Amino acid sequence: HYLPSLLTPALYHVDAQQQDEVFIWGSWLQSRMHAAGVTCSDCHDPHTQKLRTSGNAVCAQCHDASKYDAGTHHRHQQGAAGAQCADCHMPRTTYMVVDPRRDHSMRVPRPDESVSLGVPNACNACHTDRDAKWAAAAVRDWLGRDAVGYQTFAPVFQAAEGGEPSALDRLAGIASDAAQPAI
């Protein structure tokens, strides 16, 4: 669990969210935070791995709380589960019943990609009584468009996994694009 793994279909979804037990460093390498130079110890105590502070205060070390820790951003009641940055941007998966891990790619929730690509999204992790189409419509209503994230490679990975002829050139484009996460 502490060795990096390649983004293979057995371990990661096509959008590179964690699918199986992997070292979270792999998802971290995909994040905009990593690209900006943020390190593990900016959020975690290097000796205990515990968060340096609690709740949204971790994210507010860099992000403007008046803009992001607000109902106008997260669309949830203040203090509720959906109002926690990590619930939307670092969804948790529990492995073997006792090992909860958050995906550290810190992605923008993309329920539209759940609809088109079949990947999970943070909205439906909590709103289990609704489907991805509902979540995608809710995000579209809030933003006036589909959400856009830092990780844009999912449709290309899906095409590659599906054996589409255009996938090779598109994969080469991702591999040569310095703006893409290096992993």
Where do the PLM segments sit?
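Primarily the internal scaffold of c-type cytochrome electron-transfer domains
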Residues: 1-179
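Extended alpha-helical scaffolding segments
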Residues: 181-183
